[in-house]
Each structure stands twice: as C-alpha cells, then as structure tokens.
Amino acid sequence: MNRLPSSASALACSAHALNLIEKRTLDHEEMKALNREVIKYFKEHVNPGFLEYRKSVTAGGDYGAVEWQAGSLNTLVDTQGQEFIDCLGGFGIFNVGHRNPVVVSAVQNQLAKQPLHSQELLDPLRAMLAKTLAALTPGKLKYSFFCNSGTESVEAALKLAKAYQSPRGKFTFIATSGAFHGKSLGALSATAKSTFRKPFMPLLPGFRHVPFGNIEAMRTALNECKKTGDDVAAVILEPIQGEGGVILPPPGYLTAVRKLCDEFGALMILDEVQTGMGRTGKMFACEHENVQPDILCLAKALGGGVMPIGATIATEEVFSVLFDNPFLHTTTFGGNPLACAAALATINVLLEQNLPAQAEQKGDMLLDGFRQLAREYPDLVQEARGKGMLMAIEFVDNEIGYNFASEMFRQRVLVAGTLNNAKTIRIEPPLTLTIEQCELVIKAARKALAAMRVSVEEA
C-alpha cells in the first residue's frame, strides 16, 4: 500500500533531531534510545547494507558504535561514552584532526557573516583560496574549479581534459588496475573494481586500464592507441593507490609516466584526493618525485574535516578552454564561503604546524612497528607498507582482516578495510596523532594479533 506523505511526522522527526543537535551530553536511557533509533532508521531509510558491514567488523556483532562527537583532535566518542583513537581518519578527511579549533573558528566566523554566496556577485574567499592553491601546488598549476567531493573533482578533470584535447582529435583515457577515482559515471569509468562497475555498464567509452606501476605497460598502451588512431587525451593516476590497498609504485614511476605523457601529447591527471594535503609526508605525493601534473584533483582533507570541498587545479593552458564560457562546468555549492573558509584554515594549519613533516616522522614510527608485528606474526600478516600517515596491513586472507578490525575495535582503535582490496586494513590517522597515541596503536595491534592467534589455535 502506498504511504501518504505526513507533514506532522516530518515536523516531529526534524524537531526531535534539532533537540538532539542542541544537546551536549546524553544520559544512559537517552543513549540506549538513540542507538535503537539510529539502527532502525539506517535499516528502514538509509541502507541496511551499512549495518551488516559494520556488524561484520565489530566485536560482538552489535553493529558497532553510534557516533556522538569528536573527543580530542585524534579521537571519537560514541553514545556510550567510549573513546576511540581514530586510525581511519574518515578515509583521509581528518588530516588536521577532529574539530580543529582554527578550522572551526574560521567556519563559525564566516557563518556569522554569509554562509552561501549569491551566485552572481564575486565571492572573495573563492578568489583567495584559488590564489592560495596556485601558490601551494607544484609547477604551473594556476586555476581552480571548486566542487564538493573527490568524485566531482575527478569528473571536472575528465571534462577539462576532454574539452582541451577534443579539438586535437584525442579522446582516450588511460587509467590503472586497482584504481579508485570515485563512483559517478565518469569517475567510475576510470575506477577499476568490477563490483562497482558492472551494475552500471556500459560506462563511458574510451577508457583503458593498464597495470599500476608497470611503465612498460603504460608505454605499450600509449603506442597501441596511437597506432589505431585512438590517441590518448590523458592518463589519470593516484600517486599511491589508497582504496586499492595502499599500493606504492616503484620509485621513478610517476617521473616516467610524466615523460611518456609529454612524448605522446597526453595530459597527466593526478588524483590526490587521498594522498594530498600532507598525508604522505609532503604536501602532495607527487612532490616526492618533483612531478608536475597538468591537472590535480583534491578533496577529502582539503575541508579540514569540517566542510566538504573538492578542487580541480589546472595549468593556464589547459584551463583556458573554459575562459570563453565559464558556465560550461559549474556547481551550485562548489566554492561556497563556508567550504572555502575551512580550506583556507586547513592549509594555514598544515603549513604553520608543518604537519607534512610530522606525517613523515610519525608514519615512519608506526610503519616500523607494524613491520615488526608482521615479522612476529607471519602466519597472519602478509605485509605492512605505506608512506607517511597512509599505511596498510595486508593479511593472509579476507577473514583475518575483518577479525583484526574487530579486535582493534575492542582495543578502542578505529580502523577499516579498503574498497578494492578486502585483505587489507588501512591505517590513516590524523596527522596530529601524538607520539604517545602512536605507541598505543602499536600496542593495540600487538594485542589484537595475539588474540587472533589464540583464536586460530583453539579453532
């Protein structure tokens, strides 16, 4: 039977939510009621699949914690008052920590003046953020398009490359196996996981995938495309594959791809949605090899964990195809004042506190600890790898990876798997994680592995 709309029900629900937003604390009964509500509404109105996923990686199979608030810069607190060290970082959102006071203050100050712009008059913060990114990014990157997410930044990059290369008769894109660039139609065409692609086939034509890190495969693909007249418009890459399982290419790979792009007249698009903003020990991962892309995609941590924002930054030569008609590709909320305020504050914090260098130092410490554990538990752990504060522990099979996430949850450390590699648990904490918290994470991982070994031996 069709359900009739109910204004009264919607009003009551929204009023209840607003009351919850105003609260700073909950008593025991309120916590229990909220947990029941959230699970019920996820099941009935969001997506029950999320509940089953959380249940599979949570101690006791209780669907896991219901988030209530950030604790410190580096922790989360659930409705039961339990505090978790965040080693997931919202999949790379919280580079400057949770509720960073500088970022929150900037957004609050802007909110008091003007949350959204008129769309017609010139908005100052968009101009200032574009100027800041032009100064911050490598090479000749100069002009920025702002949006609301990583997949949108990739969509803009693909459209920009098409607009630039179409008059030159170049329409093909080369991406890599294991890549993740988002799930909107264009970005999904570059993404390389069949689970996400098959339900939406056919995707956009003209995309090819080659093995990541294999420069000869890249050269062969570019050559074949040239011979068949399918000339390549752009190569799109992640400097390190995040969702693919934190896969690092061989040293010199990005440099070699840059040279091939120049040789074949293809643009180089670097997707730094996850690796950017200091995550790998440099402001941008491409700086480890001094590689300068034609188009750079940013999002996630750009908003400081406070506001969603993405950016597509390009050279003047490429971006100029939009000069005659700046309305060819736009978005209503992209570059809004609140998001730009958050991004400007985030960049300021990253530079003032030298967080990229901290990411390198603390990342080395964590990775050394995880590699030691891999040596101690070779029956469970296949490898620990990473760069800066983007790390992964790969287990011998999928089930062990899920069990590790569950045991870490029991130790009050939040971790999760990767979308394209189920055996791999990603470690992606805020760059503000303290040395003491790094030590606690390593201790928690050791306890988790010890408990898992006992379980295996008893089975």
Swiss-Prot record:
UniProt cross-references to PROSITE patterns, sorted A to Z: AA_TRANSFER_CLASS_3 (PS00600)
Annotated signal sequence range: none
Superkingdom of this protein's organism: Bacteria
Species whose genome carries this gene: Escherichia coli O9:H4 (strain HS)
Keywords: Aminotransferase, Pyridoxal phosphate, Transferase
UniProt-listed GO biological process terms: L-lysine catabolic process; putrescine catabolic process
Class of the enzyme per the UniProt entry, highest EC level: transferase
InterPro entries (alphabetical): Aminotrans_3, Aminotrans_3_PPA_site, Class-III_PLP-dep_AT, Putrescine_aminotransferase, PyrdxlP-dep_Trfase, PyrdxlP-dep_Trfase_major, PyrdxlP-dep_Trfase_small
Binding site for pyridoxal 5'-phosphate: G150, T151, Q274, T332
Pathway: Amine and polyamine degradation; putrescine degradation; 4-aminobutanal from putrescine (transaminase route): step 1/1
The family this protein is said to belong to: Belongs to the class-III pyridoxal-phosphate-dependent aminotransferase family. Putrescine aminotransferase subfamily.
Catalyzed reaction equations: an alkane-alpha,omega-diamine + 2-oxoglutarate = an omega-aminoaldehyde + L-glutamate; putrescine + 2-oxoglutarate = 1-pyrroline + L-glutamate + H2O; cadaverine + 2-oxoglutarate = 5-aminopentanal + L-glutamate
Name listed for the protein in its UniProt record: Putrescine aminotransferase
E.C. numbers: 2.6.1.82, 2.6.1.29
GO molecular function: diamine transaminase activity; identical protein binding; putrescine--2-oxoglutarate transaminase activity; pyridoxal phosphate binding
Required cofactor(s): pyridoxal 5'-phosphate
The encoding gene: patA
PANTHER family, alphabetized: AMINOTRANSFERASE CLASS III, PUTRESCINE AMINOTRANSFERASE
Role description: Catalyzes the aminotransferase reaction from putrescine to 2-oxoglutarate, leading to glutamate and 4-aminobutanal, which spontaneously cyclizes to form 1-pyrroline. This is the first step in one of two pathways for putrescine degradation, where putrescine is converted into 4-aminobutanoate (gamma-aminobutyrate or GABA) via 4-aminobutanal. Also functions as a cadaverine transaminase in a a L-lysine degradation pathway to succinate that proceeds via cadaverine, glutarate and L-2-hydroxyglutarate.
Modified residues annotated as N6-(pyridoxal phosphate)lysine in this record: K300
Lineage: Bacteria, Pseudomonadati, Pseudomonadota, Gammaproteobacteria, Enterobacterales
Gene3D superfamilies associated with the record: Aspartate Aminotransferase, domain 1, Type I PLP-dependent aspartate aminotransferase-like (Major domain)
